[in-house]
Curated annotation (Swiss-Prot):
Active site: D10 (nucleophile)
Enzyme class: hydrolase
Organism this protein belongs to: Archaeoglobus fulgidus (strain ATCC 49558 / DSM 4304 / JCM 9628 / NBRC 100126 / VC-16)
Catalytic activity: 2-phosphoglycolate + H2O = glycolate + phosphate
One Pfam match: Hydrolase_3
Entry protein name: Phosphoglycolate phosphatase
Gene3D superfamilies reported in the protein's UniProt record: 3.90.1070.10, HAD superfamily/HAD-like
InterPro entries, per the entry: HAD-like_sf, HAD-SF_hydro_IIB, HAD_sf, PGPase
The protein's role, per its UniProt record: Catalyzes the dephosphorylation of 2-phosphoglycolate.
One MF term in the entry's GO annotations: phosphoglycolate phosphatase activity
Enzyme Commission code(s) on record: 3.1.3.18
Entry binding sites for substrate: K149
Length: 223
């Protein structure tokens, strides 16, 4: 059985349900885990830090789909992505769609938008601009093409003195794929995007937070 030295867990659709309510059983289970638990989310830094504090896990957080990393609650955000490239791509999309931006002033590495247009058509419009358009299941994110949760996980792992291959990761959407690629063991919850399940070493029987509990049980982290 794979024995991780740390875990990275997505938030929306993994620890929460479709209404973004945290699963209390998952929270209780994560508090019992004796190895570092890192939240890896598409959300902004202040949200991720607050969630980590509320849940009771590590202060280390991966935010904005890997575009921002923070190692201490009161520390500084380390920005890994170029937001300006993303803004330029948004300007192109605005010529074709009604684009509704989300949390624009708080995002440091990417641009987040309401899921109100065809993502595949939009991807063609911004092709070659050095960005990628990702669907988190809750919003669209235009990200620097050099940014991913996977690269951020490798960055974090190096700082922690371990390999990303010693991480187990739990997620639900396509923005978790790169994280699954670099981790030692990837677990998709039952409600996960079918594309993510193709990269998973395990798919839990239950969705979202209940699936997280099952994942931790499978890894032998709940005693």
């Amino acid at each position: 059985m794979f024995k991780p030295k740390a875990i990275a867990v997505d938030i929306d659709g993994t620890l929460t349900d479709r209404k973004r309510a945290l699963n209390c059983r998952a929270v209780e289970a994560l508090r019992k885990v004796k190895i570092p638990v890192i939240l890896a989310t598409g959300n902004i830094s202040c949200f991720a830090r607050a969630a980590a504090k509320l849940i009771g896990v590590s202060d280390v957080v991966i935010c904005e789909n890997g575009g921002v990393v923070r190692f201490e609650y009161d520390g500084e955000d380390i920005v890994l992505g170029d937001k300006e490239k993303c803004v330029e791509a948004v300007r192109v999309l605005e010529k074709h769609y009604e684009v509704e931006l989300l949390d624009f002033e708080y995002r440091k590495s990417e641009v987040c938008m309401r899921r109100s247009f065809d993502i595949n058509e939009a991807r063609k419009l911004i092709e070659g601009m050095g960005v990628k358009l990702v669907d988190s299941g809750f919003a669209y994110h235009i990200m620097d093409a050099d940014v991913s949760k996977g690269k951020a996980l490798k960055f974090v792992a190096e700082r922690l003195g371990i390999s990303s291959a010693e991480f187990a990761v739990i997620g639900d959407s396509e923005n978790d794929i790169d994280m699954f690629r670099v981790a030692g063991f990837g677990i998709a919850v039952a409600n996960a995007d079918e594309r993510l399940k193709e990269y998973a070493d395990l798919v839990t029987p239950s969705p979202d937070g209940e699936g997280v509990v099952e994942a931790l049980q499978f890894l032998g982290l709940l005693r």
